[in-house]
Every structure is written in structure tokens, then in C-alpha cells.
């Protein structure tokens, strides 16, 4: 699992790759921690190379979404594979996020 966070053009861009499983969640959460603070910046989460997401990974994304909504910003999931989208569908989270 690799998680990277950058600020580009006034918004955050998080890139996730590999497997966001329970073992990787702590590291990913530490990298993405700034996104869980209300700051008013929109967030793009690039998932092109994300191969797997566990419930602990979903918990991190929900935390990011809650913080964004509290500050009036939005979270956009980008380039999400069909397999990962199916996880969002099965958990009922598909309608919570914007997908592009």
C-alpha cells in the first residue's frame, strides 16, 4: 500500500495504490490525517492503482468525507476500478461519494 498527499491548485490530491487493507490502514491514516481536519479545501482521491480496499480503508474515506462536508468542501473519487466500486455498492457507500 502506498498513500501520497499533495496540495495542487488549492485542493488536496490523495493518491492510493496497492491494497488498502487492515495492515496498511494505520500508515494510510497517518498520511491522510490532514484531510480529516475541516479546512474547506476540496479533495480528489486518485484510485487508478488501488487494487483492494478493506473496511478499515472505507472507515478512513468516510472520515475524510465527514470532515469535508463539515467544512463545505467535496470529495471526488477518481479512476476507481469496477471491483472497488462494487465494494462501495455492497456497503451502501456508493451514493456518498462523487465518482469520476
Tell what function each PLM region has:
Residues 8, 78-80, 100:
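Conserved beta-strand termini and adjacent loop/short-helix elements that scaffold enzyme active sites
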Residues 1-15:
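Short beta-strand/loop segment at the start of cytosolic alpha/beta domains
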Residues 22-96:
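Amphipathic alpha-helical interaction surfaces in cytosolic regulatory modules
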Residues 1-4, 94-100:
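Short hydrophobic/aromatic patches at helix-to-coil boundaries
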Amino acid at each position: 500500500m502506498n498513500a501520497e498527499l499533495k496540495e495542487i491548485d488549492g485542493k488536496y490530491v490523495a493518491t492510493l495504490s496497492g491494497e488498502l487493507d487492515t495492515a496498511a490502514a494505520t500508515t494510510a491514516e497517518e498520511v491522510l490525517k490532514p484531510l480529516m481536519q475541516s479546512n474547506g479545501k476540496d479533495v480528489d482521491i486518485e484510485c487508478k492503482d488501488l487494487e483492494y480496499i478493506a473496511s478499515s480503508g472505507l472507515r478512513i474515506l468516510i472520515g475524510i468525507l465527514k470532515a469535508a462536508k463539515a467544512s463545505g468542501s467535496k470529495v471526488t473519487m477518481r479512476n476507481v476500478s469496477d471491483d472497488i466500486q462494487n465494494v462501495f455498492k455492497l456497503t451502501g457507500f456508493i451514493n456518498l461519494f462523487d465518482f469520476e
